[in-house]
Design a protein with these regions (language model features):
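Exposed beta-strand face motif in extracellular beta-rich ectodomains
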Residues: 160-162
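Soluble "head" domains of membrane/secretory-pathway proteins
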Residues: 2-41, 49, 53-59, 67-111, ...
Length: 294
């Protein structure tokens, strides 16, 4: 008669193997507690790793997207939600989407390139070129972001004098433009601090956008639909983009807040590069009275 195959013994959890290796042999109850502890720790760790690639959580401190998203500087009443980082791997952002992206809030110099124009005019490490509150000025134009700074340099004709006034109020004459297309070409090196913003995507690369009489026009056609039923402000003298017909460069996006009168957005600082797109809000978790799919 064939002997029944013996059931293979279950291997103990790794944590039990470790403690036994060091001479501790816990009883049944403690062993079960240690096994469950290992399961929970591994599950939480894997979830954290997966979530870091799939989603991120965001709190909103301002009312720039009100009433779609509520903000509060104290964060006690501010909307808090999870952001889907996967969707835009399968489709491109499109006008009307609510988009989370990284935005420059401080551009600060590192030591300039040795022998460069930046070193010769005395630019030193640690100076704020621009912040989200105070722009730099290039060719008389207020610029808040790396994109806007380099766009301005690239747009100037050869022979143009390059004068930089930083957020700290210092003015530097970097000479005349020859073949330079970025401020870094003059020997300025910087580090950029970014934070997450949430706005509504209005126009994509290749489209022309204009705000007129409270409405938005894309390639001459007025945007219609519930997502665009807001009164868009265009009368502030500080606005530089979208007031006249403005072409959005390929690979960039033009973003506005739904609460146009209280939004620091693309009208001030221009365009968001594709590399700075984070994802789409999908689940509001705070406050509990507004919990749900966005």
């Amino acid at each position: 008669m064939r002997r029944k195959r013996e059931k293979k013994a279950k291997k103990p959890a790794y944590i039990l193997r470790i403690v036994r290796h060091y001479g501790w042999h816990p009883g049944r109850i403690v062993s079960e507690i240690l096994e469950w502890t290992e399961v929970i720790v591994v599950a939480v760790g894997l979830a954290a790793i997966i979530m870091s690639f799939v989603t991120v959580r965001m709190h909103v401190p301002t009312d720039s997207m009100y009433p779609t998203i509520n903000g509060d500087y104290s964060l006690l009443k501010a909307d808090s939600f999870f952001v889907d980082r996967i969707t835009y791997y399968f489709r491109d952002p499109k006008p009307g989407d609510i988009v989370v992206f990284r935005h420059d809030v401080a551009i600060r110099t590192k030591s300039p390139v040795e022998g460069s124009a930046a070193e010769q005019v005395g630019i030193r490490e640690g100076e704020y070129i621009a912040t989200d509150q105070v722009p730099a000025y290039l060719a008389g134009r207020a610029v808040f972001t790396e994109t806007a700074i380099n766009e301005t340099i690239a747009s100037l004709p050869a022979g143009s004098p390059i004068t930089l006034r930083t957020a700290q109020g210092n003015t530097y004459s970097l000479g005349q433009k020859t073949s330079e297309t970025t401020l870094q070409d003059f020997g300025i090196r910087w580090k950029i601090k970014k934070i997450m913003y949430v706005k509504r995507l209005i126009a994509v690369g290749g489209q022309t956008v204009q705000i007129r009489n409270g409405n938005i026009y894309i390639d001459g056609e007025m945007l219609e639909g519930e997502r665009f039923q807001h009164n868009y402000i265009s009368s502030d003298m500080r606005f530089q983009y979208g007031i006249e017909p403005t072409l959005v460069p390929e690979g960039y996006y033009f973003m506005l807040g739904d609460n146009s009168g209280d939004s620091f957005d693309g009208r001030f600082w221009g365009f968001v590069p594709d590399k700075d797109i984070v994802g789409v809000p999908y689940l509001r978790v705070w406050p509990v009275t507004r919990f749900g799919i966005m």
